[in-house]
Amino acid sequence: MKTATSYAAFLLSALAALPHASAHGFVSKVVVNGQSYAGNTPGGDTSPSPIRQISTISPVKGAANKDMFCGYDAQVASQVAAADPGSKVTFTWSGGGGQNWPHNTGPLMTYMGACEGTTCDKYTATDAKWFKIDEVGREANGGDWVQQEIMNGGTYTVTLPSNIAPGDYLIRHEIIALHLGMTEGGAEFYPSCTQVRITGNGSGTPNQTVSFPGAYSDTDPGIWDKNVYDPSAPYTFPGPPLSNLVSGDSGTVDGQGGSTSSATLSGGAAPTGTASGSTPAGTSQPSSTTGTGNAGANPSSGKCSLKSRAAPTTSGNLSANYPRHFSRVMKRLLNDFQTTVHQW
């Protein structure tokens, strides 16, 4: 017979989808090298932008989906944003109807791919070769996922490699929402592509590239994650390791309350991202982390002063790390369920 813990975990996974069954989102704005560019509403009218417009705010489902590279029906954009090696690129995520991003569970990852043989405003990207420049998961000490900062209204900033060769590139920034990630096929992928033109005298080229689809599997431990609601469990990022172009002090996280975090990954590479809310915060130094997983997958942790939730226990009343968008009604349902389980 299944344990009470497994029943509660299943209920958590099922209930996590209920309050936002139709609430998804997209990248609504990017700031590249200080210049702001608005994105187009999915399926809406089209204005000049370097962000490739998608047809729906719904997530891409299935790691083998043909739209994994830039999102559903992603269209070539008319603009190419000017950037330099080491430029900062800030992404604003929005939910449907102008609401905040609705999810708070799962990693953020960023890739780049050269627009081979042409400019990005003419490049279809189906055959693009991608290299990873950033990945971030949970905060330090069993805290929240960094995605919580995006749900709180924050933005996310990555730093482009400082030695990257000049040319046109796509920046593929994605959120993988794992509120249903306890079941195979439950992960929701939200990829977004922004077109940039990098100048300068850099000569760096990536030593490893991947394709989308192809870089992930629905059974990868960081995509099908039975411990997604256990903050004490290590997380294994899907996809390739960070590119050889990424190095140095580059991992910070700023939250709504001005908290900061950073992470250092295996091989000395560090994520380049910064999640920023309404209150600016400084940059903290990378910290060593450990974890387990596939070769090439990098565990990460951060240092954010967000309020942490207690780890699940199986003694006494069941406790669980509820997604923050759980309503009182759903929590009451779970409590009633727990009472019933203990009566068995």
UniProtKB/Swiss-Prot annotation:
GO terms for molecular function: metal ion binding; monooxygenase activity. Its main location: secreted. Glycans are attached at residues 201, 207, 317. Its cofactor is Cu(2+). Residues 311-320 have a biased composition (Polar residues). Its EC number is 1.14.99.56. Gene3D superfamilies: 2.70.50.70. Residues 1-23 form the signal peptide. Disulfide bonds join 70-193. Residues 259-292 have a biased composition (Low complexity). Keywords: Carbohydrate metabolism, Cellulose degradation, Copper, Disulfide bond, Glycoprotein, Metal-binding, Monooxygenase, Oxidoreductase, Polysaccharide degradation, Secreted, Signal. It catalyses: [(1->4)-beta-D-glucosyl]n+m + reduced acceptor + O2 = 4-dehydro-beta-D-glucosyl-[(1->4)-beta-D-glucosyl]n-1 + [(1->4)-beta-D-glucosyl]m + acceptor + H2O. O2 binds at residue 179. InterPro entries: AA9 (IPR049892), AA9_LPMO (IPR005103). Lytic polysaccharide monooxygenase (LPMO) that depolymerizes crystalline and amorphous polysaccharides via the oxidation of scissile alpha- or beta-(1-4)-glycosidic bonds, yielding C1 or C4 oxidation products. Catalysis by LPMOs requires the reduction of the active-site copper from Cu(II) to Cu(I) by a reducing agent and H(2)O(2) or O(2) as a cosubstrate. Belongs to the polysaccharide monooxygenase AA9 family. This is AA9 family lytic polysaccharide monooxygenase D. The gene is LPMO9D.
